[in-house]
Curated annotation (Swiss-Prot):
GO terms for cellular component: Golgi membrane. The lineage of its organism: Eukaryota, Fungi, Dikarya, Ascomycota, Pezizomycotina. Keywords: Golgi apparatus, Membrane, Transmembrane, Transmembrane helix. It is found in: Golgi apparatus membrane. This is Golgi apparatus membrane protein tvp38. Residues 387-411 have a biased composition (Basic and acidic residues). Residues 150-259 are annotated as: VTT domain. It comes from Aspergillus clavatus (strain ATCC 1007 / CBS 513.65 / DSM 816 / NCTC 3887 / NRRL 1 / QM 1276 / 107). Residues 104-121, 182-235, 296-419 are cytoplasmic. Its main location: Golgi. Pfam families: VTT_dom. The chain crosses the membrane at residues 83-103, 122-142, 159-181, 236-256, 275-295.
Amino acid sequence: MPAGYASTARALSLPMSPSGTPSPADDDIQSPPWGHLIPNRQNTPSPSIREATSFRDQITSQATRLLYRMKKTWRRLNFWQRVGAIGAVILAILLGLGFMIFTGQVFLWLEPVAETWEQSKLAFFVLWLCVFFVSFPPLVGWSTFGTVAGFIFGIWKGWLLYATATVLGSTCSFIVSRTVLSKFVNRMMERDKRFAALALTLKYDGLKLLCMIRLCPLPYSVCNGAVSTFPTVHPLMYGLATAIITPKLLVPAFIGSRIRILSEQKGEMSAGSKAVNICSIVLTISIGVFTGWYIYKRTLARAKELEAKERADIRRSLQADHAAHRPHGSFSEDPDVNTAASILARDEEERIGFNDFDDDNVDLVIDDESGSDNSSGQTRKHLQGSYRDEFTDNDSDVFRDGDGADSETYHLHTHVRPN
């Protein structure tokens, strides 16, 4: 008997199950008393540890993805593009430092004339125009002008100037940006499904979500241009949302008024008064930053919730229409909402697989056995079709016609993708 057969025979002669079951005593010997874990008590981290670990993992994951995207983008750039990118980063840093230095010099320059300009209507109008025009992207300086308004005119008069110019400026910027960026909006709606989903979420609680967006710490002029690209947002609604959040504008006006008090009474003010004013400025900035960050997180969570709800509604509608074998109708009477929903519906159809698979149709690929590559390619090209379980007047019945006089043998390979 060959060696291979002998080894196989020995393997088959071995028992299929263990010789005996272990006794409880053996279990006690193998496992010490401290090895027995109390269920639901051991190896279960506390909620605070789980939340900390989850938050840390999210930060690490986001940083890893951002680093990967930066490396991927960097590899695609040629030499001169890399030089330009490095130059742009250096220029942005220098501009930021210069803006901070310039802002400090502005208050030093305004200190001698602030008392005179406080009663000047021309100064009020000029500063109002400055706040109005920085609403258009990509201009900057909106927050600085708000602080200057509080520095010159005080907290309440400065807030009135700042709020009215902000509401009118943001509304006009919204209208102009939508007119100029109309082609860009159409391209974004067609290419980016996330853009269509975000635009569609604004139809639920659009005013509430717009107010949350306006409270987020986003660049002011850029935010005006970005929100204008959502076709479901109307200019009056955007202006109303901006007017609702105008109490937020008291923060820069208050900071400006405190800075003026510190600059005017720095020789006469006691250390305690200085500490109170400085602490009030720091506390106001901290509250503004924390509130902006919190609202930003809540805005993202609400947008994801509304997007999931909209996708679920569209998915149910698609499945119902598919089961009833009827074409999809319009999703809304509003053309902008219907456009965004239709784009999102195509994305859902691709996810579900309605575009790639039909229960009544099976793709057949007919391969000729002749062995010729040319004939095989032509057969696949001309004889690939869809099998249907009913016949029309133009289709032939194989049970009536038979195999024919000159029959050929084919292999039928069905390629069916599971749903």
